[in-house]
């Protein structure tokens, strides 16, 4: 078999069956076993949840980088570049490494047909092993119990972020059912960090933790988050003993994500004998330096244009709360592109009170809701105007309303399309530093 180019490797991997068609960690477990268990010499932090997984991952990796712990980060989906999924110390994997590892994996006979997600996870862990990573922050793709990442074994720390209604056709239609799937990553011997949850979800998580004899449980309680303020494009807050923390990440929901990352980092650093004084410095600097594209990210300040990957009811509720807090009394132009299997009616309802108008887009995905249908749904509410966005060129700074802010949201895939368009038009490629 001739060696594939970078583009051919991606084409081969991305055309494998998607993880949603065959849930389960068995294939990934088989692959990793055949590859010599590349994860065995690194400490893993495993993260599940409906919202906030990527942000918590980014915060954690930034903190561990400050501590001098070489850390791999595995997330999905990517926004613009496939390589965003696989990073070490904030740097994306190179095209050459993707090509080399991709060729090796595609030539291997695993005795079954891996999904795209199986291949991505295997590539990530091989890369982290080659780079001699001491730690890996691994984000689940879908759920937890049947997710490919559950093949990694027992993580040192497990984190479960906010649980809400998403992927209900696969995970279940009630919070306790969804929580049971997420709780599938909680294993005997791990240490557990939880974000605050609705009672039905929290009960399931705590019952699972008790059943699995989890050695330590910490809960990121928002009552411990104080002195929050927004100033000059940055947020400041205090959490427990950490006073006046600074972060570039925007949104009120990021306070809780940062708190969860702090608790997980405390456990991880303490396990390595790092003093509280040093740990506080690493945490403070790591939180301050974290960047995470596509999450309340400002692409233009004058005129103002922000993109946010909120793609379910809870995520859009957090976006709405953040906009009210950061820009009190203002109304916004919204640009929306969603998947047809999402609860887009709830998403619309959350933002209608803040809307001047909506423009809708058909996302480039077979799962996308048509822009015309979405526009008609908004129009039928009778609250504000709704129309179609005919070209991303309408979102360029020279075409935006200077008097009011414009916010694009609804899907990470949609945000990725906008990010790529901005890069292509401005010819500015963002630094390969992810966080």
Placement of each model-derived feature along the sequence:
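Membrane-proximal helix-turn-helix segments that form the acceptor-binding/catalytic region
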Residues: 179-187
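ATP-dependent carboxylate-amine ligase catalytic core
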Residues: 25, 32-40, 66-153, 171
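Conserved beta-strand/loop subsegment of P-loop NTPase cores
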Residues: 157-161, 186-195, 359-360
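Extended acidic/charged loop-beta regions that coordinate divalent cations
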Residues: 77, 120-170, 202-243
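Nucleotide phosphate-binding/pyrophosphate-handling subdomain across enzymes
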Residues: 41, 130-131, 135-140, 146-159, ...
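Beta-strand->loop->alpha-helix junctions that form or flank phosphate-binding loops
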Residues: 74-77, 195-196, 208-230, 247-252, ...
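Short functional linear segments
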Residues: 1-49, 56, 62-67, 74
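ATP-dependent carboxylate-amine ligase
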Residues: 2-4, 153-154, 267, 311-435
